[in-house]
């Protein structure tokens, strides 16, 4: 059985992965992976160190710690069981969550229909026709990238959604791969688009025998 491999996305500097649980299996000896509080503090301090000689103002490390902790506790609930990454190119910016997972293929559903459904390419609720583009991954092949504007049901604000999807088929195994982002700030999504494209191209499906590499490095 193959598995969703997001390990290579962890090497991209604007991205921080939120562990799936605390502590995460295989990371029991990693101090920052034991609790969300330890994780948030570790990355808050590390991000500011990465931006030296720019110095944080008094309280900014604590503020970023609190922000990261909030995302660690709340973001995974939006799409349970999805891998969650935060795009954070600067410690003074607000994180942008990205969700990644495998989606079971419904029986008889063809590739094009499935990918358009997953990406909301034909969403009737969009305030204007979604921008649908082919998107190639070196690991997953041809897929779709869809950018859409829609009205949030709770706030009535116009939000921006960005989704990517591919179909993976190898032997008897098949699944769809889905990436989801959304934000009320269109500029935040558009500014991050190149980074998100790069992130999307690192996602892959790996064989069982490669699973140990997840915990060994």
Segments the model singles out, each with a brief description of its role:
Residues 1-160, 168-176, 181-217:
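N-terminal targeting sequences that direct proteins away from the cytosol to non-cytosolic compartments
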